[in-house]
Amino acid sequence: MSFWKNLFTSAFTPISAEADELIKEDRKQFEENTPSKKNFETQSPDEPSPKTTDSTGARDANLSLKTQEPIVSADDAKGAQGKGADEKEEKKETIQPPEEVKTEPPQPEEKEGKEAKEPEEPPKEEAEEPQEGGEEEEEEEEEEEITDPLEKMTQECMDAPDCKEVKHHFEECTARVTKKVEQGDKSEDCIEEFFHLYHCARDCADPKVFKVLV
């Protein structure tokens, strides 16, 4: 047991001594680099300030940058964004493409020539109108020439010997009624005598007209 104890102590004693020396050196270096509160109070203004580590320098630089940056509130940021959007819209409104000027192509001279020729057409229409009027006059003359054969033969039969007696009674009635009308008496008329004469003339004219048509 004592053998193993002596062996363990002889092996690890130098290592522990070296470790203690390293720890002491690191602590001494740390104390030299980090200034204490006592040093700041007792330090004279002529003495140089103790050295600071890189971490403390970086921290001081960040603090100085934060103090220099302006503090912008949320409302100010929104207002700045709104102003930027308004300025962009105004630029879009002001920058507009130039309006295209529509120019009508000049009309060809052929159309003018056609327009100049158009007034010459009405005389042709005027010349055609007299022809149409002449045709209508010819048709009217033909219609006037064509007479109803029944009326013609009925008139002839009234003067025929077969209807001579009936016609005589009609003429006497007509003369008598005319005198009464002149005196203001309208009590008599000759309608019955007229129909007797007309029927007599038709009885005479109808067979003759039938023969002509057949």
Curated annotation (Swiss-Prot):
Residues 126-148 have a biased composition (Acidic residues). Coiled coil: none annotated. The keyword Electron transport applies. Disulfide bonds join C157-C204, C173-C190. Residues 25-157 are annotated as: Disordered. InterPro entries: Cyt_b-c1_6, Ubol_cytC_Rdtase_hinge_dom, Ubol_cytC_Rdtase_hinge_dom_sf. Residues 25-40, 84-125 have a biased composition (Basic and acidic residues). One of its GO terms (cellular component) is mitochondrial inner membrane. It holds the Pfam family UCR_hinge. Gene3D superfamilies: Ubiquinol-cytochrome C reductase hinge domain (1.10.287.20). One of its GO terms (biological process) is proton transmembrane transport. Residues 41-56 have a biased composition (Polar residues). It is found in: Mitochondrion inner membrane. The keyword Nucleus does not apply. Keywords: Disulfide bond, Electron transport, Membrane, Mitochondrion, Mitochondrion inner membrane, Respiratory chain, Transport. It is a peripheral membrane protein. Component of the ubiquinol-cytochrome c oxidoreductase, a multisubunit transmembrane complex that is part of the mitochondrial electron transport chain which drives oxidative phosphorylation. Belongs to the UQCRH/QCR6 family. Component of the ubiquinol-cytochrome c oxidoreductase (cytochrome b-c1 complex, complex III, CIII), a multisubunit enzyme composed of 3 respiratory subunits cytochrome b, cytochrome c1 and Rieske protein, 2 core protein subunits, and additional low-molecular weight protein subunits. The complex exists as an obligatory dimer and forms supercomplexes (SCs) in the inner mitochondrial membrane with cytochrome c oxidase (complex IV, CIV). PANTHER family: CYTOCHROME B-C1 COMPLEX SUBUNIT 6, MITOCHONDRIAL, UBIQUINOL-CYTOCHROME C REDUCTASE COMPLEX 7.8 KDA PROTEIN. This is Cytochrome b-c1 complex subunit 6. The gene is qcr6.
